[in-house]
Regions:
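Conserved tyrosine-mediated DNA breakage-rejoining catalytic core shared by Y-recombinases
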Residues: 124-131, 158, 163, 167-200
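Catalytic-site neighborhood detector that most strongly recognizes the C-terminal catalytic loop/helix
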Residues: 26, 128, 182-186, 196, ...
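DNA breakage-rejoining catalytic core of tyrosine-based enzymes
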Residues: 66, 108-111, 121-139, 185-195, ...
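N-terminal DNA-binding module of tyrosine recombinases/phage integrases
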Residues: 1-71
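N-terminal DNA-binding recognition helix of tyrosine site-specific recombinases/integrases
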Residues: 55, 63-78, 82-116, 159-163, ...
Length: 295
């Protein structure tokens, strides 16, 4: 049968399409190179963003584009799913992608953006250490490395993030309080220290920048993983160093500290993040009944 030859290279003269044709084409890696330092501060979060965007560029096979359409977005999400990414992980990666594309759009590098829809995240069970588990795990850490033991104590009693603790300087510890400056949300916070957290920072300064500056994340995680296997927690994926932050939060909530103060202690930007621990406050509604009982 007759099939017409379709000329896809028609030139439209509307102002809109003229504008489109003037837009240069960029790959995602090029856009990241252009804007990453403007959009994200230095730190571990920026490092993660860099690898997220690198992975997405690789999924897109480094193609250059002047508009990012829904189909491209769907193919990225589909590929991340095939790679075993959970919805929560996909949302983190999409947040980075959308922030970069919005900036590129604002600067006139990309003329169209897809609609980003958050994937539904399951409220994952928050695993924390019971005192007995902490004791066994910390003893195994200590038998391998005294510095890592001190750091473990500090993490579980201050609830700070691993990077925040390793980045501490001596100046950040004043009169039984510690100030975290290098935080994920770029807001400093100051928390008082428990006796054993204080003790964990009391070592000879020598040439060290801070109490845990002789350690790095890779080395600490290695020691942690060996200790974890030794005490029979090897198959529990959730027993990572970050569990110490969850453990601190859950102890505060179970001890009757109100959720707003727990938020301030942990340095969460939104209360919603802290609400993940709220259900642990088993008896915090009992006082409501007292108020309502007719005297």
């Amino acid at each position: 049968g007759y099939s017409p030859v379709i000329d896809y290279n028609l030139e439209y003269t509307s102002v809109k399409s003229l504008k489109h044709r003037l837009v240069e084409q960029f790959s995602l890696a090029e856009l990241a190179g252009k804007y990453i330092n403007i959009l994200w501060d230095d730190g571990s979060h920026k490092y993660n963003v860099k690898s997220f965007l690198g992975e997405i560029d690789e999924i897109l096979k480094g193609i250059r584009f002047s508009g990012f359409d829904q189909e491209m977005l769907d193919s990225v999400i589909g590929s991340l799913r095939e790679r075993g990414n959970s919805n929560a992980t996909i949302n983190r990666k999409m947040a980075a992608l959308s922030k970069l594309l919005r900036k590129a759009h604002k600067m006139g590098d990309v003329y169209s953006l897809p609609e980003f829809v958050r994937q539904k995240e399951r409220a994952g069970r928050i695993r924390f250490l019971e005192y007995e588990e902490e004791k066994r795990l910390f003893a195994a850490v200590r038998s391998r490395c005294e510095d890592s033991y001190r750091l473990s104590i500090f993490l579980v009693d201050s609830g700070c993030r691993l990077g925040e603790a390793i980045g501490l300087t001596w100046n950040d510890i004043q009169e039984h309080r510690v100030t975290f400056w290098l935080t994920k949300s770029n807001r400093s916070r100051t928390v008082p220290l428990t006796k054993r957290a204080r003790k964990s920072t009391e070592i000879a300064h020598e040439r060290l920048k801070g109490p845990f500056s002789m350690l790095n994340q890779v080395r600490f995680r290695q020691i942690w993983n060996d200790a974890k296997i030794e005490v029979g927690l090897g198959t529990d994926d959730q027993v990572v160093p970050h569990i110490l932050r969850h453990t601190c939060a859950s102890r505060l909530v179970r001890g009757g500290i109100d959720i707003r103060r727990v938020q301030m202690w942990l340095g969460h930007q939104t209360l919603q993040m802290t609400m993940r621990y709220a259900h642990l406050a088993t008896h915090d509604l009992d006082s409501c009944v007292k108020v309502l009982e007719i005297r």
